[in-house]
């Protein structure tokens, strides 16, 4: 007979094939949305599922609530053959690998302005030549991640935001570890910088795309 067990949602990060993991984590995002919007914020009436779209509707006053989706940027900052990578503080993020600078977009900000602000806040650096890469839904934090490349603009001395990061540094292409799980836009950005393209990464490492 089948055996089932309760697992943290982080287990989706290591699940294959990736389309099943995506379906599972998207379902948890929808569940989280519905659990947090049971009652209308305007009149207090019990909400109902919309019959026409992915939303909750109040049958009393007509208030409509949509799933929370917060835009955030993630940026691979380079200085020649070096890439800036960091590690999160344990209490702030369960991910223990090398990370790129990332953060949520604030009200009134463009994506580019968010990049400049987040980079200055977290590592005290300036960047230029910001270039869009691609986007990815990231249901773990109700986020739409927008990926970019950027180049260092000025001195490379890092001023660490210690309440967010435990460390940050510049790493030559040859020092960047190969990714073993290509399920995030951050992994793609690092491998595109290291190898020049995802295709080259797959060719050199023999990594099998498990989408």
Task: Indicate where each model-derived feature is located.
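Unchanged
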Residues: 1-13, 103-189
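Short linear motifs at secondary-structure transitions and domain/linker junctions
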Residues: 14-17, 31-33, 49-53, 59-61, ...
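Residue-level preference for alpha-helix termini and adjacent loops
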Residues: 32, 38, 46, 64-65, ...
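A broadly tuned preference for mixed-charge, low-complexity surface segments
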Residues: 42-45, 93-101, 124-141, 199-204
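N-terminal strand-loop-strand
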Residues: 55-99, 104, 126-127, 131, ...
